[in-house]
Swiss-Prot record:
Cellular compartment(s): Cytoplasm
Superkingdom of the organism of origin: Bacteria
SUPFAM superfamilies: YnzC-like
InterPro entries membership: DUF896
GO cellular component: cytoplasm
Biased composition (Basic and acidic residues): 61-74
Span list, region Disordered: 53-74
Entry keyword set: Cytoplasm
Record bears the keyword Cytoplasm: yes
Descriptive protein name: UPF0291 protein EF_0064
Pfam family, one: DUF896
Stored Gene3D superfamilies: Helix hairpin bin
Sequence similarity: Belongs to the UPF0291 family.
């Protein structure tokens, strides 16, 4: 993922300095989509491991999240 981000930043800098060709613009779009897909996957993995407890120690994780976690781990 770091290489994708570096390439995105390189293209952004080049765009500011001299502009991008249509091929580079298409590459930038693809790289951004790949980066966002990776971020979303990481977020979902993190969320699937979350359990929410109230101050008394009871599990108050929303049912919808519990259902999604069940699907994820099955």
């Amino acid at each position: 993922m770091l290489e994708v981000l570096k390439r995105i930043n390189t293209l952004a800098q080049k765009e500011r300095e001299q502009g991008l060709t249509s091929e580079e613009q298409a590459l930038r779009v693809d790289l951004r989509q790949e980066y966002l897909r990776t971020i979303r996957e990481q977020f979902n993995k993190t969320l699937m491991g979350v359990t929410i407890y109230d101050p008394t120690g009871e599990d108050v994780t929303p049912e919808k999240l519990k259902e999604e976690q069940q699907k994820y781990f099955d």
